[in-house]
Amino acid sequence: MPITPQDRLSRRQVLMASAALAAGALPRVACAQERRFDPQPGVWRTFEVTTRVEIKDASDATRVWLPIPSIDTDYQKSLENTWTGNASSARIVADSKYGAKMLYGEFDAGATPPVLTLTSRVQTQNRATDWQRTVGATEDAATLKRWTRPTDLMPTDGIVLDTAREATRGAWSDEAKVRQIYDWIVSHTYREPEVRGCGVGDIKTMLETGNFGGKCGDINGLFVGLCRAVGIPARDIYGIRLVPSAFGYRELGGNPAKLQGAQHCRAEVWLKQRGWVAMDPADVGKVMRLESAEWIKDERNPLVVPVKRALFGGWEGNWMAFNNAHDVKLPEARGAKLGFLMYPQAENANGRYDALDPDNFKYTISAREILA
């Protein structure tokens, strides 16, 4: 059949449409390849963080504990705390083992609902490690020993030790062991959105059941536990995200007007030639699970690669640390110890309030950046 001019036109239109589709796809590929996540230290930011707790039931005497930033390091300066409310007494207290500070308020039984508002001012900055340069790091031997010990939820023997040995097989230096544990965590664990709060951090149960889904308290807790099991000092740092990420990652920032649920724990390890080094494999899993519409299961994805690279040795300073305490016994409390302290806590004669139940335990957290 002869080709008509109309046929030629239709063919050209098809070719032009195909070219347009190909051209339209290029920016998306380039955009994915150009995603950047590279926090670098050097600029300090100042934040004012306000936590307000209101207890609806005023019929019993009530006790309230609000975590206070207790960290002073090369990445955070905890400056000052002020508070208001109708407590019969309020004061700053600390747990006896780790020194985690908190505002403690006592409220008498009465008709007025207990209210306590805490305002904390901090300065933060990004963290990053120059892996091409070693430093003359020193730390007290007793301090390092402390950060290799087990906790109630973080044993370092049995299945935890066996898993750590398997994950570090063939690695001889502390840095190589930490790298292999980090990679093992990223490849074996995953973010599970249905887990309440930041998770429990029961790492033995995770390994025994083979259920590696969790949140930061579980995943970074497992990372820390595996490091400790092979003799590498490591610790969780419990805190809260304050503002959006400067790199456009939605899941790696917080809404400063409403920070309930923005609590997040990170981790540190002690490397002989580096000192204390930042780590956050849990946030790699969070990006893989939640940053895009579909669950990313390949850590080589262009959205994931820069995050995985940067969070081995660094983190973004849009986050405030509270403390690094485990097995926290709240001063003056009648209830059980907490695995960690990131959320406001309260109790009355009926027991401990559920900090994740907004209907009965109402609190708000907000942040404001103070610009010079």
Locate predicted features.
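N-terminal secretory signal peptides
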Residues: 1-9, 20-23, 29, 33
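Intrinsically disordered, low-complexity N-terminal segments that are enriched in acidic
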Residues: 15, 32-128
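A mature extracytoplasmic/lumenal domain signature
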Residues: 68-70, 120-122, 135, 238-240, ...
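Short loop/turn segments at secondary-structure transitions that flank enzyme active sites
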Residues: 70, 124-128, 191, 242, ...
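Short intrinsically disordered coil segments
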Residues: 80-83, 132-140, 281-284, 339
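Acidic low-complexity segments
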Residues: 94-95, 115-192, 196-210
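Active-site neighborhood of thiol-dependent amide/isopeptide-bond enzymes
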Residues: 170, 174-178, 183-265, 272, ...
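Active-site rim recognition segments
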Residues: 244, 248-372
